[in-house]
Amino acid sequence: MSTDNPLLSDAPLPAFSKIRAADIGPAIDMILADYQSGIDAITTPAASRDFDYVMLEQERLDQRLSRAWAPVSHLHAVADTPELRAAYEQAEEKITDFASGLGQNRDLYAAVQAVADGPGFVQRTRPERALVEHALRDFRLSGVALEEPARTRFREIANELSKLTTAFSNAVLDATDAWQERIEDERDLSGIPESGRAVLREYARERDLNGWLVTLKQPSVQAVLTYADSRSLRERVYWAYQTRASDQGPNAGKFDNSERMEKILALRHEAAQLLGFANSAEESLATKMAKTPGEVLAFLRDLIARARPVAQRELEELREFARSELQIENLEAWDVAYASEKLRLARYALDEEQLKAYFPLPSVLDGMFQVARRLYGITVAPVAKSVDVWHPDVRFCELRDASGKPIAAVYLDLYARSGKRGGAWMDVCRARFHDGSDVQLPVAFLTCNFAPPAAGRPSLLTHDDVQTMFHEFGHGLHHMLTRIDLPSIGGIDGVEWDAVELPSQFMENFCWNRKALDLFARHWSSDARLPDELFDKMLAARHFQAGMFLCRQLEFGLFDFLVHADYDPTRGARVMETLEAARREAAVLYPPAWQRFPHAFTHVFAGGYAAGYYSYLWAEVLSADVFGAFEESAGEEGDVIDATVGARFRNEILSVGASRPALESFIAFRGRAPQPDALLRSYGLAA
């Protein structure tokens, strides 16, 4: 095979430094042509209807496409350029159209159905049967049974949605990069700690500017809204951040996602109805643990009923504190983080800046890897050899089993920078695949947006940042520790969307455990362990404003579900109207009328969480209950890093992927069904 084009190489890892925008189109064209030839061979009437020929061959074809597309998609998210974006969008359109055609290929559907109907099917392994069952379900959800003109229309919708969601995400990225405010007088930064100022100074230096540069990157927004004494600066940053890509704010109309949201919701609804569903919320549940919209809404509203009274009390306490101690008569949205930090400091004497000194990024990484070693008997360490990466800050680590044998790898890209999508995520670079010859080992991308090292200090993380890191590593372990050899149902692929957050949220619990913290909570300059006094304060403050936080998540989840479930073609999307309705049910603090949160809600309008944001809380029930098993084994020492329970968790949940239903895997581990009260206990809200 030609290796002139790096995207056509069979090398174990992508050659990131060699990938050019001009490589993308030719590589994808060639791979899709070969893919189609492979499908044509499978679907010829004389072809075998054997599992290996029909199913394994599809996995091989799909993996070749994935090996090329995964690095391209990743570069689009972390190293965006106009040329790359244009090439990505053109290729994405071709891939989406190809995938739509594949999902509606009746000859291929018949071939897969023939495998399921074959005499030897019941003797196949559980993962092999699951692969076939998932494929048949996905054919039905792709409109394979539709007749013309609905069949063509469904395919058109898929292509249009792909373009719109990409455009939505690009608009958010562009809007984030488009606003900045230069600060020349350091007095305007009063209240912002030195670590935060260092980040703002670094942003200015990158642009050859003197002074400090406030941007809409997460470290900057967090520093200003949490610490800046200047109320006007907080308001300006909040205004710019909360109106990104909308009809409001400093760049009103320039990157506006309003029309895109209207079209996205209309098309999702139309596609769902073509498939026979009442709405796109109902359609989304075809691949989730929850089975009906009523079940999801009852779940959310039950939590609202329990959390909202607590949140209302918390907000009144905050308002009173702001009035009496900060002379803020009317608490506004841009005051909340600032006043909350002051209240937390007053109540618990917990200084977040003091705490950050004990979470230097290198130490946190090392400790996180030690937790994984003690739980699962694996080692995670940087590789000695040079590996091709897309930015000098990127690290590459290998996972090895107890015998020292490599089993997986992960790229770590952890610092915020221009041209990089905000937030934190794990994505697949390579999936585990064994087709009887060589084994392709799983490789993950782990991406965060932490403040980079500055002023001679390493990157210092907030405790929330530490939890974010553990969360994404939990996703990574789910992907990397799979023992399933079939990529479509291995790792996170194919797992019900409202269960996929279980392994990630589970890992967050170790950030609150003394034994685990002792592995990595060390002062960046003195190497002193986290003092007991500081740990006790941290623990005491753990559930500070838990009701307000939970209500905010419930507001997001309810808005997302209602905007899909209640869509009415005669009335349009009613995005802001639906958000107001969700706030009336779930919120305790109402932002200004000009706030445009949905316009940058990429999880729902450009990610996989459409009618699925509730999944975070649903999975949190599962993860809290799972962690309960570790707490039960901890004994008086409180050591929850139990290798025996860890091995059971790995064997029953992490490693089985989607080879069986998530509920079945949960029961295999816990010995019973999930208990919803586990979530309330984890928030300190249980009666």
Positions of predicted regions on the chain:
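C-terminal, non-catalytic "cap/extension" segments appended to globular domains
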Residues: 1-23, 30, 190-191, 198, ...
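His/Asp/Glu-rich acidic catalytic environments and adjacent acidic regulatory segments
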Residues: 2-30, 35, 77, 84-291, ...
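Short pre-active-site segment immediately N-terminal to the catalytic Zn-binding motif
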Residues: 451-470
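Short, hydrophobic/amphipathic alpha-helical patches that form generic packing surfaces
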Residues: 64-74, 137, 239, 336-344, ...
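C-terminal non-catalytic alpha-helical accessory regions
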Residues: 32-123, 553-563, 567-584, 591, ...
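Charged/polar positions within long, soluble alpha-helices
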Residues: 40, 44, 67-77, 96-107, ...
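Membrane-entry segments of alpha-helical transmembrane domains in multi-pass membrane proteins
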Residues: 16-28, 50-55, 253-257, 296-303, ...
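Active-site-proximal, well-structured secondary-structure segments within enzyme catalytic domains
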Residues: 127, 131-133, 155, 160-163, ...
